[in-house]
């Protein structure tokens, strides 16, 4: 049995080897749908990308004329170093998401393929509700690793990542509801044969 690595160690290595360059390509379709859903009715917004990787979403979305502030946070030192190298305009922070608090709260938090790398994702959901978001704000996340997406179940072994928590769509919604989010809903995008699609979960802080 091969020794498993922490998610941060794995993504540090991705940044080192250039494997992170595929993140935008692989996730752009689902993330664009999340962004459209989250921002279509907003005249302006400030946002945090939770688990920003090399900063591709922060770079792209900060160019939206309605975006007044964009912050990327990630636990991987190499990812943040790369993000800062590629983008001198926006703010990037290397920190544990569970411990970090922004200097200024935002009205949108987006996260793609991050939450299941935490031992207790509900704890992170609650922390974001309490410490990151203003009133009248939204958290929206996308995940590909969930119970209904059967093909993803082998990923912990395939990738050698030590923490990957597998939950159902309803369990993910419960995490949001238990963290006091309202108007919680979920749906799936980009489904195809043998692939249930990216699961999107969102809720509002009113």
Question: What are the language-model segments listed below?
Answer:
Residues 164-180:
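Short alpha-helix
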Residues 136-144:
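Conserved beta-strand signature within the Rossmann-like core of class I S-adenosyl-L-methionine
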